[in-house]
């Protein structure tokens, strides 16, 4: 790896001011050479490393105090390289200092009991200001150059700082010696602090948030030292002074200026005057608020240093003021030239960074300053020779700055030393963390933190454990206000914080995205920037990989393996998770414990753990856009999320795949296409037809998943909004898919999904769209016929079919259970219809008058012949009507376990329907006969099977025709039946019951089994007539068979025996007809009684209703007449009253007339 090795490279980096803009005069002179080179880990001092580590591990929100928007501060030159030049997963080993040396620095920013409290700090500040006003009343902000008269010249930090300013190009020998001496001095100071605090060093792990008991802070030590030094001579002061004197002598021996220092000084004279003028002008323009920006601790330290300055240091400061001012101006010019080439957008943030770093670096400064001041007070002559050297240069440079800049320079020099021999570049961890923090923080955020945490101390939880997962993948580019000096400069060199964390880049934001505050954007934390811009970023130590989102590639350390689970380390020290696309903010904000199963479940939704970006400068990715369009009007996307899971689980791959690009892009694109086609389908767009042609059944399955997953009201609304042509096409495509045998597995999955739906009720189904209801019923029943229905079947019937309340056979559609049957099959199987469904497989077909179905003689439940043979429900059983030990083929009913003999069943089927069959159907029935009696053990069954085989072979070979074959098989069946004695005593021969869907009523076939008091007399009469007709046909068939036998001329027994057999047959027939006649007579008597009872009941009901109706009419007439009477009476009364009034008036008029006549007569 290539790195800067000499001063030439450094000069090359500092001489990049090609535009020649004037440098910024208000920057500190030491900003351009702030510890630019550093040694390796083994060469660094434990104190410096520990101090840097303390600030990298603990950044308190107290750093945000005293923030002012118009203050200007600058970052170090390590920020002048591009962030993208370094690999994402790299973390330098030089930024991992020893833990042993970091504890004391970490504790320095103590707990509630330290001297950094607000009240004590304000009190000390007021005391310092009062003392300062008494000692130096002439000092003002308008004369910053006069401050050099009161600056202490005996500071070791100032002396070291002047060397870094004056000679940036060290020799190998001088650099090494200086690093050693400075390390010793700092280490001694740290040991003194640790001796007073009496604390025990212990390692702090990254996850630990609670510090150990806090020692006294540096501010408290500074005051204590000041107070103790005022006492008369004591042994402790003598010992301390001797130790400091030895340190000063070592610094004096090693602090030899290089030859290049003179050349730099000559160069600095060129821009010295201009720099001084600019500095003065910028100081005059500072407002009263700028004074408030000075950190309180830094102000206190400045006052303490001013009050303890002796006459010797003042004289030396005046003597070297002019000579070192030009050197300081030259350093400022070089710094401004390099720093201001960066972007102006981050200038304001970097200024904030300067203020906060000065405040945080303060605690190490006061105690060393006061120690040196006391030494100068006691033994100024002895140390005069050591002070006169290079320390005056730094003192004069510090004199030209504001108090905050002065303390910053002293603090930087006390911590950051150049130790290496010009090989590596090292930037303080505190500066780097500060720059990174402030580059991501907004101004309003800083003000909020100032308000919320105004009373907090420096002690707080460590943030080092958050650095791994809090790095943001996207740079913030936020314009801030620029000062009047920098407004005219062009933005040439972009300065930005370097992101070296192990988090995945651009995981949730698209390329070019600007907003990092949106959901799912990780927050950037402070990153360690310790590499130069010449570092080789394409080395073999880093590999190209793909993020889980498949958005873009990134470089990372091979140790960050993709073989780990995604949620393995998500709970370490409550770190911010890497993937934040699934409401991570709420989880991390509430500190709720995260379930890892949720990670896998949500990440598997898009395949291979991919999370789609939400926005790309106003343009939504197709999958996200479709999801937005599919959302409900009330803003809910729950249904879309449920369906997204169902879609994604079938195409998801392992998130640990070594090639995440392929799985993520392919599955994501397929998922996006499915969602887009579904959206187009619902919106009525024509593009869904193109998607159907391209996707085929996949598109139909996608829409079906939406239908099955969404709630019923939502899907009903969407069906109402769909065009009619889309609905028709959808039904047709679903029907084609159901007819495709390759989709049986998928159809079964759809049926299981519907079976698990508990929110579908009969009320919702009746209110749903007709097409939606037909699709649901077709999918659940597995019958595509429901997709071709017209309006002949009502929606209520379809809803009942879906709820298993009605038979799904379109030819049956009886209410379930049939005849309120409570057998073990009807009561256990939902939606089972005993009239048309198989007892074994629960399926139905349109076959009738066939041997492919067998029925029970008692309960009339049916079963497929193939199912009965397969499940051994058709087997050999004991013949109850024959001799003991005889067997026959029987069907043992699954519902009632009653055996029904098969020979009589086959005989009835052939006698009644054989003449109506076609050739193919006749051959099929013969095959079923062969199947039924294939395992028969009785003679009749065997003979019938052999006859069926011979007849089937003859038909297939065209030896005989269909009519002749039918006559032969019928004659053979009749002959077998008549030659068996057991059959002659059969009490009853019945015809083949038809399937229930071909009967007029479910109770029609069971009427003859019921009591004579049945409620269906018409059916009983019809049954009796049908039985008689059947026996007449049977008789004719038997006669024909006998005649055929006689015509064959086969050898027979004597004619007498034949006659006897005919007589026996006639007697049997007579007995049979007599029995049936008796049955018919009994049925007729029963019907007569029923008719009489019905008539009586009807007459009684008629009379009751007529009487009730007559009474009501009479009452109604009476009420009307009464009302008429009352009306007439009221009219009569009114007439009588009117008459009386008229008579009274007439009498009055007559009286008046008489009086008038009398008066006229007089």
UniProtKB/Swiss-Prot annotation:
> Which Pfam families did the record assign?
Oberon_cc, PHD_Oberon
Q: Point to the regions of Acidic residues compositional bias.
A: 203-213
User: Which GO cellular component term is one of those annotated?
Assistant: nucleus
Residue stretches in coiled coil = 1065-1161
Zinc finger map (PHD-type): 835-899
What CDD domains does its record include? PHD_OBE1_like (cd15612)
Q: What happens when the gene is disrupted?
A: No visible phenotype under normal growth conditions, but the double mutants tta1 and tta2 exhibit a rootless phenotype and seedling lethality. No visible phenotype under normal growth conditions, but the double mutants obe3-2 and obe4-2 exhibit broad growth defects and developmental arrest of seedlings.
Question: Localized where?
Answer: Nucleus
Q: Where is the composition biased (Polar residues)?
A: 135-146, 163-182
Q: What segment(s) does the record annotate as region Disordered? A: 1-235, 251-307, 321-346, 441-485
Q: Where is the composition biased (Basic and acidic residues)?
A: 1-19, 61-77, 90-99, 118-134, 148-157, 225-235, 263-300, 336-346, 441-457
Q: Which GO terms describe its biological process?
A: cell fate specification; embryonic meristem initiation; embryonic pattern specification
Q: Which domain of life is it from?
A: Eukaryota
Q: How does it assemble?
A: Self-interacts. Interacts with OBE1 and OBE2. Interacts with OBE3.
Q: What is this protein called?
A: Protein OBERON 4
Q: Which organism is it from?
A: Arabidopsis thaliana (Mouse-ear cress)
The primary gene name is: OBE4
